[in-house]
Amino acid sequence: MDAGESCGLFLGATTSVFDTRAMDFWDIARDAKMGVAANQTAESIAAQPAEFRQIVGSGADVATVAEFGAKVFASEVLLTNLGNLSFDRQFGPVTLEAIFGPAVLAGFEGQQTIGVTTVNGALCLLHTSHTPQEGLLEKTQSVLTQACDYRL
């Protein structure tokens, strides 16, 4: 892969709470983006692992760590987004058609994760769960398709 300094492990979590009754899709998306923006600063990103190290490093028992994780990762649905990626599609005889992910499970019962990646202009969605909610991926795709068609 020869990724060099372009490869790393980046972890973080933030929660966005919004009222879906009064807004259309794009208003919700803007509201969610504003809700997580404060946690996207370098200071906030650096502080998140420090909080975890403080809990784990103090010799906390399993129940304390589980309670901390449940609080930090509490959500109805987890949405992960790698953003808009652009790179070569051809790797010798192999052509990259899509990338699906990220596939994330925080380990909570009933957790539903939608991983979003846009590669060379193609939106790719992945539903990850130990107990997948039937139709969630299809509904997500439908909502996104309608929202994007509306903007055109």
Predicted regions and their residues:
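Acyl-thioester-dependent acyl-group transfer interface
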Residues: 1-152
